[in-house]
């Protein structure tokens, strides 16, 4: 059947910002859908609020709207663009919920817009727990014993029937948000209260516990002719009770019998038919009782998902692309298999002859005091995927990819005692992010296999695999590595041992182990991901390393090869923005005739799509793998500046190994990263820095701190996302920092800065070609200096800085770029205090603001800088004059505190946000208002506001309180703040702090009296009232600000109209070009 011709234009909904439970896998799926449908000749209208996505690049769609994914905004876009159809299955839960809202408001019916890829009925049947259970019963499939409730009273009535432990799952949420496992009445009440608030339909499913059952997933694709294929089976190593996004998973499933697999396969196909997924992909989750083989259906997602991205990368089968093509009427047998080409169609199920392991990446260290135990609510930030010929090989490669300081099964226990045995057993029973390594320690401590199984409920097949690795480790510790033979060494490598891990076990250096291996002429070979287990020849160079005999890499002798090192797993501080830059580098250099080679290990990203670069190596970004790929590919150059700190940390070792690094040299990178060397350059240029000193130990720090004066900002070298940065207010804080944190940074000096209070922070992105400097954009932060730049909203152009200050900033950026011999991208951060300009730091690499600036100005900075690295000047690329747009763009951040209940959501020098959104308006307040709507800030136009600020903010709060009064808000304030307001003629109701009398803050919060909270505290104090305020605000979705600057911007936004300026990126960029 040909594609549908009755549809001319399609509106695609994106997923919005990166949050826990919904990450960059939806940029991957959305980008694939845009490309596929555009190639078929459809007009594509795209809506997404996330500027850091490839899908929002202006060439991906005909009309691109970086706007909030909110039904009221989509309504305006529909009125402007008049689409024929809407595709909601590429944008995760956000897009599905939005299309339901559009349907409920009658907008789709009014404008005669057809939903493709899914139907309202199929979405409701899959997402509504009662309808889903009814559908499964109809086709003879079991589901867990469960009840639907809509309030706390109903919940209490059903729990006695279900019994404890019980699993609570809210409807229409993502990543298990608001859910959890309740072991008693108190936990049950708390989880249900939270779940009801987060569920858009105010509906909870109370499930019987299936903890300990084995969990599986099937990725299924169906077309309109009822052709169905299973793309991939996925097995969770962790049993039921842990969210699948937080589980270690393996593909294909390893412990299913053929009969179980066939039953699951048939059930999956029946489920898609019954739910009504007629065209596209879906994910179906099952649980199997390991005692008797009983199978039940957990749930299904009638859309592409996190697992779809993993399955696509695991098999090479582009699920999102195929699903988009099926949505417009094509069938599986009409679509070719892109990897194999003409020999096969998409109707053949992929066959794989290797093993995939996915391990999630957590960031609990960023949220002190959070509950780090793993449950049904997802908490991981990112993930890695590794490929090997065996499970053991892929598992060890996955661990090497995580960048958490492990090279394999590194021990978590320093000294084995009876106390440590207790610790190990507790970690096995109550799963945390490090349980895998504690299992290894359990084997080292000779804890019986049967006991490890009873504590973890992980299938014994996986436990035996881990035990064998630990046995081999003990063998490595005993041998004389200098006398090792080729076959013996190869045996270790086949089991997944890296050179570094062998070095650690044999008490040698990695360099020595590599030298021994090279002398033995032992090197990996590379196999291809081809969807068919090598049954057909193919030209797609999507590869992984292993230790067999035949190599399928077949590198050519082209001397125009560029290797791009990716950013590895998503984590706070290093996210999708860096992948965006890597993709742009590959695109630009391919356009210029270079063969691009990508090395990365993140299955969620666009950079690991098989058609982004000429050759893709899905490998850990570690020294060993890079040197091996460089050895066989012999590239012209290697780009290390686009993948964040992951590749930058390897710069010196790569240079020592004669790897041809292009762009800014490792020495120049060190000049900016090494605090002592950078200080000399700033001094030479007669520029200002806050009073500072570089120290290497506590004694030096105490002496220098007396000279610098408190408060002091502590900045380690070679970190990203403000890792371990802290503001300290006295010697006690300083001592604690050095005793608890600095042990991780022994190799590098530590910078102590005088902390500039109430300063404005400014970010500048620029490109230098060695002769000229192009200013990409000057961004003014909304939060004051001291809040990490990645956690502060910012505006382009600057919204309060005068022209003289901005011109001086431009001058200083140019001086720094030329002095540091930057060749490519650089980012400079300044603090402005009383018209004085202070340099905070310079990063001669891609910054997380590059996508935002590129979208705001229409200048593809990452592409231009990549061309600079290969020798093209800025003049040759016509990059001469800075682009200053007439509109305002505001980047706002999205914070994950709702996943870490009990943690004070306080902003500081260490980054905590997971993602970002962008708002565009004719003025600052409209742009900021739109950004807040996109970030799902719950702003009200009237109601009661609670204000409680620290002493240093009491002067500044007065004018803001006046504005709130004028808008029509009623004010409450704590004692000191109320006194300041009343003395300034502003009426405010006094509210008691805890223990000051009833009713107090806690009572008023419980009574839902507030619509907005302004609460600032001294960073060096933990205030009981503040913790209660923050937690209540999170639980009840009350908008809150923790800084005066943030409150000032919020109040401006409250008075704006975000819907009056909605335009496409293409029109906006055309306007910029015509006026610059």
Swiss-Prot record:
Q: What is this protein called?
A: Carbamoyl phosphate synthase large chain
**Binding positions for Mg(2+) 3?**
829, 841
Binding positions for Mn(2+) 4 per the UniProt entry? 841, 843
Q: Which positions bind Mg(2+) 2? A: 299, 301
Q: Name one GO biological process term.
A: L-arginine biosynthetic process
Catalyzed reaction equations: hydrogencarbonate + L-glutamine + 2 ATP + H2O = carbamoyl phosphate + L-glutamate + 2 ADP + phosphate + 2 H(+)
Give me the residues that bind ATP 2, please: 715, 754, 756, 761, 786-789, 829, 841
Gene behind the chain: carB
Pathway field of the UniProt record reads: Amino-acid biosynthesis; L-arginine biosynthesis; carbamoyl phosphate from bicarbonate: step 1/1; Pyrimidine metabolism; UMP biosynthesis via de novo pathway; (S)-dihydroorotate from bicarbonate: step 1/3
Q: Where is this region: Oligomerization domain?
A: 404-553
Annotated region (Carbamoyl phosphate synthetic domain) at 554-936
Question: What are its GO cellular component terms?
Answer: cytoplasm
UniProt organism field:
Buchnera aphidicola subsp. Baizongia pistaciae (strain Bp)
- Domain writeup: The large subunit is composed of 2 ATP-grasp domains that are involved in binding the 2 ATP molecules needed for carbamoyl phosphate synthesis. The N-terminal ATP-grasp domain (referred to as the carboxyphosphate synthetic component) catalyzes the ATP-dependent phosphorylation of hydrogencarbonate to carboxyphosphate and the subsequent nucleophilic attack by ammonia to form a carbamate intermediate.
Q: Which residues form the MGS-like domain?
A: 937-1076
